[in-house]
C-alpha cells in the first residue's frame, strides 16, 4: 500500500530495478517457450489468420472496458463515492495500462491514487474496492475453470490442471479469509499498528466491508460473468481465425479453460501483465491436448497481440491524452 499523500506514476516506475528485472524474466520465459519451435512455422501460422476474426476479437476485448468500469463504479458507490461511468472507465483503462508496464499489479495502486485525485477518497479505502473486485474475478474464474476442465478432461485431469485449479481455490480462500479477519479484528489489529499506518489500515478495512453490499452483489456477479464470457469469446475468435486452415478441432470447453487459466495467471502476475506466464499457459495447455506446438504458439501470439500489446498501445495513447494521470 502506498503512502496516502505520495504521488504515483507508472512511467516513473519503469526505471526501477524490480520493473527491469520483471521484464528480463518475461523475455527469458518467452525465449525458452518459443525458441524450441521453428520461427518460420510460427510466422506461417500468424500470417494465415483471418484478419476479420482478429479485428472482431479486438473489438470484443476493448468492449469489456465500460463493463469493467461500471462494475467498479458500483463498488465505489457502495463506499459512498459518486463516480460517473466515463470517469470510472477512464481510470480503469489507465490502471490497466499501468499493469501492462509495471509488475505485481501496481496499476491497482495507481487506480487508488487516481480515485483519490478525482473523488477525494483515500487510496487505501478505494483499494478495498479493487481487492473485492479481484475476489469476484478469481472466484468466477476458478469455478468456470473447474467446470470447463471436467468437460475437457473428465475425471482424469492432468496433474498440472488439478494443481492450477487447487491453487486458484487456495487464492480465493486466502482472499476471503483476509476480509473476514480484517473485519472481525479491525480494532484489535489497528490498535497494535504504528500511528502512521493505522488510519491506512482502517480505511482499507472499511473499503473491504462497505464494498460488499447485498443490493449490488447480483449485478456485480452478472458483470463479472459477462466479462469472462467476452474474454473467452476473444480467444475463441483467435482460434477460429486459424481453424479453416489447420483443422484443429479445438472444443469450446477447451478454449474456455485456456482463456480462464491465462486470465488467472494475469490476475496475480510477477511480470507486467503476466507477460511470459500467460503465453506459457496458452501454449502449454493446447500442446497438452495435442494441438501442434507451432499452431499453439501462433494462437498465443495473436491473442496476446490483442490483450497485452494492443492494451499497451491503446492504454498508452489514453495515458498521454488523459488529464487524470
Go through the PLM ranges and name each one:
Residues 115-122, 280-298:
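Interfacial segments of multi-pass membrane proteins
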Residues 94, 98-102, 127-150, 301-313:
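Membrane-embedded alpha-helical segments of transport systems
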Residues 1-93, 151, 157-267, 306-325:
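Predominantly cytoplasmic-facing regulatory/coupling regions of multi-pass membrane proteins
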Residues 95-103, 258-279:
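Transmembrane alpha-helix interface/packing and boundary motifs in multi-pass membrane proteins
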Residues 85-90, 107-109, 121-134, 292-302:
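Membrane-interface alpha-helices at helix entry/exit sites of multi-pass transporters
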Residues 73-76, 109-114, 280, 318:
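Helix-loop junctions and terminal segments of transmembrane helices
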Residues 82, 93-110, 208, 272:
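Short intracellular "coupling" helices and adjacent cytoplasmic loop segments at the cytosolic face
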Amino acid at each position: 500500500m502506498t503512502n496516502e499523500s505520495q504521488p504515483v506514476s507508472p512511467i516513473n516506475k519503469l526505471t526501477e530495478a524490480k520493473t527491469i528485472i520483471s521484464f528480463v524474466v518475461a523475455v527469458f520465459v518467452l525465449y525458452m517457450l518459443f525458441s524450441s519451435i521453428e520461427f518460420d512455422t510460427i510466422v506461417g501460422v500468424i500470417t494465415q489468420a483471418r484478419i476479420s476474426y482478429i479485428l472482431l476479437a479486438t473489438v470484443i476485448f476493448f468492449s469489456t472496458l465500460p463493463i469493467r468500469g461500471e462494475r467498479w463504479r458500483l463498488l465505489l458507490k457502495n463506499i459512498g463515492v459518486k463516480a460517473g461511468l466515463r470517469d470510472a472507465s477512464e481510470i480503469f483503462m489507465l490502471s490497466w495500462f499501468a499493469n501492462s508496464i509495471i509488475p505485481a499489479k501496481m496499476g491497482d495502486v495507481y487506480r487508488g491514487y487516481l480515485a483519490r485525485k478525482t473523488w477525494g477518497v483515500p487510496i487505501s479505502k478505494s483499494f478495498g474496492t479493487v481487492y473485492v473486485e479481484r475476489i469476484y474475478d478469481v472466484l468466477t474464474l476458478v469455478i468456470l475453470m473447474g467446470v470447463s476442465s471436467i468437460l475437457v478432461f473428465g475425471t482424469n485431469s492432468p496433474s498440472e490442471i488439478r494443481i492450477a485449479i487447487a491453487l486458484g481455490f487456495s487464492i480465493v480462500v486466502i482472499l476471503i479469509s483476509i476480509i473476514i479477519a480484517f473485519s472481525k479484528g479491525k480494532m484489535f489489529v489497528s490498535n497494535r499498528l504504528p500511528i502512521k499506518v493505522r488510519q491506512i489500515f482502517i480505511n482499507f478495512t472499511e473499503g473491504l466491508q462497505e464494498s460488499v453490499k447485498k443490493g449490488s452483489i447480483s449485478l456485480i456477479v452478472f458483470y463479472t460473468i459477462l466479462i469472462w464470457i467476452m474474454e473467452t469469446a476473444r480467444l475463441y475468435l483467435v482460434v477460429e481465425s486459424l481453424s479453416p486452415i489447420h483443422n484443429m478441432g479445438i472444443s469450446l470447453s477447451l478454449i474456455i479453460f485456456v482463456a480462464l487459466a491465462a486470465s488467472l495467471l494475469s490476475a496475480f502476475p510477477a511480470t507486467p501483465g503476466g507477460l511470459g506466464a500467460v503465453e506459457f499457459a496458452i501454449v502449454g495447455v493446447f500442446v497438452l491436448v495435442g494441438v501442434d506446438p507451432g499452431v499453439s504458439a501462433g494462437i498465443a501470439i495473436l491473442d496476446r497481440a490483442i490483450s497485452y500489446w494492443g492494451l499497451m498501445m491503446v492504454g498508452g495513447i489514453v495515458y498521454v491524452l488523459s488529464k487524470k494521470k
